[in-house]
């Protein structure tokens, strides 16, 4: 008997609250790669350049990472990451900006505060189920593009040169439909997980 684990990602959202005069501002983002993470963190640090801490955790293609950013070790990033993993989230970055209010919370309350940040933002957000799929290149011409079958796929890049090259995220079933349409050459770049459908948990 096989155990099937459903994986989910999440749509971008923001939440904030205050505990003992410290403000916690939480963001959650859908990410595709480490470049997304770097860009998001740079934008946040520019916008909140006077914050005390920028704590974050992410799960990307089932690889995970967290940082406490000068909070006591294990009290900040890890609690956020644990909540992400508990909810089977993937391709997700959660960032908590803290403005220290002058009152030290202590290790236990601080851990609970960061856990609350992650839990609340997830409850407020749209969850999207993931399924197995592919990142592909479709090499065709303008006639082929006009004859694309009406299927769910995410076109992430278009290159119009001598030939038209679309970079597409697509699930297995729709890849077969695209192949059977015979509108061009298909190259599989890599196996990935793609969005399945929107749902609230």
Where are the model-predicted features located?
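Helix N-cap motif at beta-to-alpha junctions
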Residues: 33-35, 141-145, 169-176
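Active-site beta-strand/loop microenvironment that shapes enzyme catalytic pockets
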Residues: 79-124
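Long, charged alpha-helical interface segments
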Residues: 162-172, 176-184
């Amino acid at each position: 008997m096989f155990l099937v684990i459903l994986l989910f990602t999440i749509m971008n959202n923001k939440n904030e609250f205050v505990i003992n005069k410290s403000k916690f501002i939480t963001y959650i983002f859908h990410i595709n790669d480490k470049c997304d993470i770097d860009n998001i963190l740079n934008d946040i640090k520019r916008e909140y350049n006077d914050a005390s801490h920028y704590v974050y955790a992410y799960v990307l293609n089932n690889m995970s990472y967290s940082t406490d950013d000068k909070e006591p070790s294990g009290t900040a990033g890890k609690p956020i990451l644990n909540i992400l993993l508990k909810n089977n989230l993937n391709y997700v970055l959660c960032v908590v900006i803290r403005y220290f209010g002058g009152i030290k919370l202590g290790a236990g309350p601080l851990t609970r505060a960061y856990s609350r940040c992650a839990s609340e933002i997830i409850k407020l957000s749209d969850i999207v189920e993931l399924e197995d799929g592919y990142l592909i290149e479709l090499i065709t011409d303008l006639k082929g593009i006009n004859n694309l079958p009406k299927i769910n796929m995410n076109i992430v890049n278009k290159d119009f040169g001598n030939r038209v090259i679309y970079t597409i995220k697509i699930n297995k079933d729709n890849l077969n439909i695209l192949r059977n349409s015979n509108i061009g050459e298909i190259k599989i770049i890599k196996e990935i997980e793609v969005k399945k459908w929107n749902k609230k948990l």
